[in-house]
Amino acid sequence: MEAKAVARYIRLSPAKAREVVGLVRGKSVDEALAILRFTPQRAAGAVAKVIKSAAANAEHNNDMDRTRLVVAKVYVDQGPSLKRFRPRAYGRANVIKHRTSHITVIVSDGKEG
């Protein structure tokens, strides 16, 4: 059985967030949270929050045992970019794109149905 949690429009670059989610894919929920606690990247906090939410969804909605939960799938999709202008010399301007991410976590206990 599976449970899912999604965090949308997170102000993180998807490329930087994908580096962090690779560390926890396939690990147990408690092990994944322990790894993220000691990961210095800023994305680690956001990923940990989504994993906790997915585990809480599994416990509350599906009556699953938290100790048996595994991070079955975790992926990061790109959200909309916030466009800002940076003034440059001679009256020009460059576009600065602040990228956003959608983080999806699916936890499973290994049982079917």
UniProtKB/Swiss-Prot annotation:
One annotated GO molecular function: rRNA binding
Source species, domain of life: Bacteria
SUPFAM superfamilies the UniProt entry points to: Ribosomal protein L22 (SSF54843)
One biological process term in Gene Ontology: translation
Gene: rplV
Complex formation: Part of the 50S ribosomal subunit.
Keyword Ribosomal protein: yes
Family: Belongs to the universal ribosomal protein uL22 family.
Protein name (database record): Large ribosomal subunit protein uL22
Cellular component GO terms, alphabetical: cytosolic large ribosomal subunit
Keyword line: Ribonucleoprotein, Ribosomal protein, RNA-binding, rRNA-binding
Record CDD domains: Ribosomal_L22 (cd00336)
InterPro entries tied to this protein: Ribosomal_uL22 (IPR001063), Ribosomal_uL22_bac/chlpt-type (IPR005727), Ribosomal_uL22_bac/org-type (IPR047867), Ribosomal_uL22_CS (IPR018260), Ribosomal_uL22_sf (IPR036394)
Source species of the chain: Desulforudis audaxviator (strain MP104C)
Task performed by this protein: This protein binds specifically to 23S rRNA; its binding is stimulated by other ribosomal proteins, e.g. L4, L17, and L20. It is important during the early stages of 50S assembly. It makes multiple contacts with different domains of the 23S rRNA in the assembled 50S subunit and ribosome. The globular domain of the protein is located near the polypeptide exit tunnel on the outside of the subunit, while an extended beta-hairpin is found that lines the wall of the exit tunnel in the center of the 70S ribosome.
Matching Pfam families: Ribosomal_L22
